[in-house]
């Protein structure tokens, strides 16, 4: 999926770095400067593959390119030893809560066993369903899993990140979160599906539910619910996104980053929505350990 709102930011980046349209076009594999000109004016799209190539070619951090202040997460609680050396407070009880995606399982939490030196690691289990049906389940399970802990870290995958933002923002003991291929706007996901299949609001309202060719089912009740979603997420969050993700589109991701100054983006240039190969799991491990 392409992103049309990125044009002014690309132009600003190019100007700040004294690049001509010809030079930028050549470095990104475009034929001629006219493509860059159209992108900057908002008349043409720039795919996330090209954005990832831009980041890699010019050794940029996504937050730097989009002028997003990726503030560091709050440090873990510390105490000052007699020698004035700052060390971590070993008396704190810490837990990592993993929230799986669609058709996933809490058992996937075992993939994060390497964190057990400092954290208990648990998975939050839930059955797929409508968001309004899952609210009490997810909040109840999360409270049960985190009771008695001083510090909580959330690792959420795909739609699990949506549930975290939607239902866990009021839990004050969450110190940091890691979102992998997060669905950051369920409403936008539904709108994109409707556009893809040529479905209008009126048609969905009249039919109530529409089964799509890919097996997904659109529901008007679901559409109404997510249209009123309110994101109050303030937790310092690391976001991992595949450049070839065909589920979460560029526009949704950029809006999330702009709306959440405590979020920081990492793009894996050769990944899709699902991170499941041994190499991709090693990438996730290094990504988490780098900032936790």
What are the residue ranges of the model-derived segments?
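A short, Lys/Arg-rich alpha-helix, primarily the initiator
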Residues: 1-17
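Short alpha-helical DNA-recognition segment
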Residues: 18-38
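DNA major-groove recognition helix of helix-turn-helix/homeodomain DNA-binding modules
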Residues: 47-64
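Short, charged recognition helix plus adjacent turn
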Residues: 66-90
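Short, surface-exposed "cap/lid" segments of acyl-processing enzymes
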Residues: 85-129
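Catalytic nucleophile-loop/oxyanion-hole region of alpha/beta-hydrolase
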Residues: 123-146
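Gly/Ala-rich beta-loop-alpha elbow adjacent to hydrolase catalytic centers
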Residues: 155-164
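The alpha/beta-hydrolase serine catalytic core
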Residues: 174-267, 271-292
